[in-house]
């Protein structure tokens, strides 16, 4: 039997664990001094490929990134 007293504080605040861990990671990165801060910010970038499927076959993949296009 689970008790409400054992609920993690991030869940009690209405957050998911992923959003909580992202906030914690941002706080840690902001506390770093240079050059470690610049290195951490470059590792933060995410790139991924997205393919739509039609008739059971993947279409041409589209490369996406979380960084804004310049």
Curated annotation (Swiss-Prot):
The protein's name in its UniProt record: ATP synthase subunit epsilon, mitochondrial
GO cellular component, one term: mitochondrion
PANTHER family, per the entry: ATP SYNTHASE EPSILON CHAIN, MITOCHONDRIAL (PTHR12448), ATP SYNTHASE SUBUNIT EPSILON, MITOCHONDRIAL (PTHR12448:SF0)
GO molecular function: proton-transporting ATP synthase activity, rotational mechanism
Keyword Ion transport in annotation: yes
InterPro entries (UniProt xref): ATP_synth_F1_esu_mt, ATP_synth_F1_esu_sf_mt
Membrane keyword on record: yes
Source organism: Arabidopsis thaliana (Mouse-ear cress)
CDD domains assigned to the protein according to its UniProt record, in alphabetical order: F1-ATPase_epsilon
Subcellular location, principal: mitochondrion
Keyword annotations from UniProtKB, A to Z: Acetylation, ATP synthesis, CF(1), Hydrogen ion transport, Ion transport, Membrane, Mitochondrion, Mitochondrion inner membrane, Transport
Subcellular location: Mitochondrion; Mitochondrion inner membrane
Subunit structure, interactors included: F-type ATPases have 2 components, CF(1) - the catalytic core - and CF(0) - the membrane proton channel. CF(1) has five subunits: alpha(3), beta(3), gamma(1), delta(1), epsilon(1). CF(0) has three main subunits: a, b and c.
Protein family membership: Belongs to the eukaryotic ATPase epsilon family.
Modified residues (N-acetylalanine): 2
């Amino acid at each position: 039997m689970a008790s409400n007293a054992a609920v993690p504080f991030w869940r009690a605040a209405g957050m998911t664990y992923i959003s909580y861990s992202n906030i914690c990671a941002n706080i840690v990165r902001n506390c770093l001094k240079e050059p470690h801060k610049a290195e951490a910010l470059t590792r933060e970038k995410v790139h991924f490929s997205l393919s739509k499927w039609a008739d059971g076959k993947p279409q041409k993949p589209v490369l996406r990134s979380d960084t804004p296009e310049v």
